[in-house]
Every structure is written in structure tokens, then in C-alpha cells.
Amino acid sequence: MKAWLRSVNESIKPKFMPGGAQAKWFPIYDAIENFIFSSTHKTTNPIHVRDSIDIQRIMVIVWLAAFPAMFFGMYNIGNQTLDYLTLVGTANTNDWHHALINLVGYSNNSFLTKMWIGAVYFVPIYAVTFAVGILWEILFAVVRKHEINEGLFVSSILFALSCPPDLPLWQAAMGITFGIVIGKEVFGGTGKNFLNPALTGRAFLYFAYPSQLSGDKVWIAGLSDTGIIPEGFSGATPLGYAAEGGLQGLTDNFSWFDAFLGNIPGSVGETSVIAIGIAAVILLATGVASYRIILGTFLGMIVMTSILNIVGSDTNPMFQVPWYWHFVIGSFAFGLVFMATEPVSGSGTNAGRWIYGALIGVTVVLIRVINPAFPEGMMLAILFANLFAPVIDHMVVSNNIAKRKRALSYE
């Protein structure tokens, strides 16, 4: 089968090469060829390469590493939705999601039913995100006459996982459009962007359409459709409770272990620290993620949280929240593993990665605690650090050069 596919590919390849009838569509042909086959280019001369990893493999590893968070996110959507609809009933639901869910029904509280409900909400968001993103990638590749790389696989799944389950599909299209075009392509494409494309798209949605990205009605699928909030029920996330009641507000409504497992309202892929931890192991073991950034961010968060705990406040209950709660609520774990470690927009020097990570950890706590307008600060903290990454690397390199010059002057 593989040999037959290779022969078919070789027979049509001349049509897409320079001078061929379909030469203008070479980026599309090249993307399909690279997706199906491994590269045919072989190096014959001695080279200075320690690993065979390339952009294609890096992107595929990150994409696959996001699967545990994705599958748990779908389960959690189904679980939260069934719990909510048990209270309000299904008679009040009338959008297209529930028409699809009714193919299976709400009565069965099984694992597969919960996965189906989660898939009904998440898969359309991911499909629209990927389809719109690939259209923009193809357009820029054809116009600029360069290859289509696998970066969209990562940007699309991370963007979709960072969204609430009830996000309108047209907003998903708008968000990924902004992330791909403004966050990446206008700067030259993959490898030249200084902002994380997925986070750029989500930040655009957050400020352009705040009612769909924040509040108490967007984190549980179906709640925004019915608009019914039963007595004693809230769709607020742990961060929402923490902003109002501090540590007491958290412990009155959630256990730390539930937050660690991910059985809480939130964005699709951001709730389960265990699922995200699996991804962290994969990315660290393959060398895709930098342990310096992860540890730097984690330590920065602990230090800043501890300082604020000691300082305290009589008017702001967020000062009471300890570091081990900050770790399991909001998008801290997701942003730490998938967004902060993105190699293009982050620092490239070893010392710079420690500083870059610490900057993220300190900033996310300051935004969460000090700024009442943004109870979740991970997105803004990473984008803020993205802006400083080139400066950090420049300072590290300049300092190393100055050290070498001083050392030479003593010889």
C-alpha cells in the first residue's frame, strides 16, 4: 500500500514543481506529502546534528501530548452538563447541541454518555478552529510561496482547549483568525512570531467578547442556553469563588483533590492537573519543553504567593489563597505546560528561561490577587513575558560577552 501511494505521489509530483501546470499549489501538495510520508531528503556529508527531531516531529509530539487533557475535558463537560440538567430538566434546552445529544439521551449516566456530550460541544469548536486556521495557512503559503508546516496542529488544539464549552462557533473562527494572522503570519509565519498564536487568539476573544469568555454562565455547557440557575447552584469557577471569598470561598465549594483531578467548571482542557501532568512528562522526556521554564514559573508563583500571604489584606480575600491552590485552579497548569514552554515566543537562553519562567509565575499571581478585573491571569502573564523574552535573551547574551571580555583582560 505504501509503495503504491509513493508511486502515485511520484507520478503527480512534476505537475506541482516549478514550471508544472499546478506549480502555484505546491505548498498544498508539499503539506499533504509531508503528512503522509517521511522526508526523502538525506544528508550525505558530515553534519553537526545531535538529534533527528524536526519541526514536524515537535509539533506532532505537542499535539498528541494534548490528547489526555482533551479527552478528560470532554468527559468533564459531559459530567458537569448532566449534573446541571438533572436540576433544571432537559425540556428547557433547545439548541442544536441538545438535538445531537438526544441521539443518545440524557438518562444514561455512563462514561460513554458523558464523553458523547463532551464531544458534541468540543469537536465542533475544534473542527471550526482547525478548518479556519488551515485556510489561512494555505492562503499565506500560496501567496508567499513557502511550505505549510505543522504549527497549526498545535495552535488549533491549544486554542480550542482554552475555550469554554459553549463558545459560539463564529467566535471560535474569529479567535483563531486573529491568532494565526495577527499573532503569527504578519510577522513572517512559524518561527518568527514573538507572541503565542493560540493565546493571542484567546486574548482577542477575551477583550472583544467578554460575556462569552468570563462570568458564571459560560463554563457549564447548556447553562447559557437555558439561562436557568437553580437555587443553591452556581456555574462559577474556583477562581470566581476565590475572588469573592478567598480560601474560605474555595474550600466551601470545592475540595483541593477535585480541583487536582479536574472535576470543576472551567475551559475544556484546563481543569485536570493530572491530564496536563501526563503531557508535561511527555514534553520533558522528548526535550520539547524546557524544565527551566516550568520550574522557574512554578517557583516564581510560590515565592510571590508566599509574600502576599505574609503581607495579607483586610479587604482583598485573594491574599489568603496559598500557592497549592493557585497551582490547581484556573489555567495555571495548562499555561505552564503548553503555552509558557512554546519555544518560539519564549526565551532561548538557559539563564533567560529561568528569568522568563519566574516572570510568568510572579505576574500571574499579581494579576490574580491585585487586579480585581482579571481573576485569571495566566494568559496575560504569558503574553506579557513573550514581549520581554527578546530583552531577557539580549541581556543574558550581553552579560556573557562582558564576562568573557573581562576574563580575557585579566590574562
Where are these regions (language model features)?
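N-terminal signal-anchor module of multipass membrane proteins
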Residues: 1-122, 126
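Structural signature of hydrophobic alpha-helical transmembrane segments
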Residues: 115-129, 166-175, 262-273, 319-332
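Generic transmembrane alpha-helix motif of multi-pass integral membrane proteins
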Residues: 155-165, 182, 278-283, 334-340
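Loop-to-transmembrane alpha-helix initiation sites
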Residues: 173, 194-198, 323-331, 353, ...
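Long hydrophobic alpha-helical segments that form multi-pass transmembrane helix bundles
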Residues: 191-277
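A beta-strand-loop signature enriched in Asp, Gly, Thr, and Trp
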Residues: 294-350
